[in-house]
Amino acid sequence: MNEFKPKVALIMRNDEMIEKFNLKRVTIDTSFGPVDRCFEGYVYNVPVLVIYGRFNGQKVPSNEINFQQTIEAIKNRGVTKVIGTFVVGGINPKMPQGSVYVLGDLIGMSGYNIKWDRNISFHNAEMYEPFCPQLTKKLCDAASKMDFPVKTDATYVTFYGWPRIETKGELKFYNKMGWDVVG
């Protein structure tokens, strides 16, 4: 049995970090099958679990990713704090390409995942405050020390993203609404 107890899960792919901190590859069993693109170890003395967002080498559209499997894998390791890094499209014209955003809110325009298995452990997610205030504060504090553009309290708008990406008109609308990033 694995005695390592991660405090934070990072949903990301950063092979350089995995190598730098000598994170150990692990397989996490779930009711959906094993998740084998997971890594555990210490990053600056914090015990972390790194799990690829598109694990197991999947090359599928976002709507075919089994998010339930990711959630279950994280839960099975006892982690309650999750940080995700994602590639998104910038809407805010004041922020240059390559900017970093710390999200403060989100707008859901992508509908519902009809493949979600409603026969298991159903509960609604509380989304009034969608991001952890303590983690957000830590990210903002760290961001204030960076020498590149960081927008804190950014608004993220979800978009299905498959089989198409946003139209010019949709992006203009999102910008007029004051939203910062889309994905």
State the predicted function of each range:
Residues 79, 105-108, 140-148, 179:
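Generic secondary-structure signature for well-ordered alpha-helical cores
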Residues 129, 180-183:
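Catalytic beta/alpha-barrel core
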Residues 129-176:
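Active-site rim beta-loop-alpha module in soluble metabolic enzymes
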Residues 66, 81, 150-152, 181:
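Residue-level detector of short coil/turn "hinge" positions at structural boundaries
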Residues 32, 65, 134, 164-166, ...:
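Residue-level recognition of alpha-helix initiation/capping sites
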Residues 1-127:
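Metabolite-binding pocket within alpha/beta catalytic cores that recognizes anionic/polar moieties
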